[in-house]
Amino acid sequence: MKITIQTVGVTPHEPLKERIEKKLSKLETFYDKIVEAAVYLKVENTSDKNNKTIELVVKIPGNDIVVKKTGASFEESLDESVDTAKK
């Protein structure tokens, strides 16, 4: 599975990139035909502390799974996104 990470207004640190790759590779145990997973990281322009948004797009033949979550940290948003995609 190919993993793509794109960002808007933020530069992810290496541990975050590694966490993203590790979490997304676990999705293959649920969907064995995943072609690509794209992750979009964005810091929303708001005064709210829950301003870290992750949009996860999992491409599988015939359908795409799209999950968008916002939280206080990218790690929190990532965990929620992957958990939702598993369902």
Model-derived features with residue positions:
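N-terminal, polar/charged subdomain of small-to-medium soluble alpha/beta proteins
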Residues: 1-87
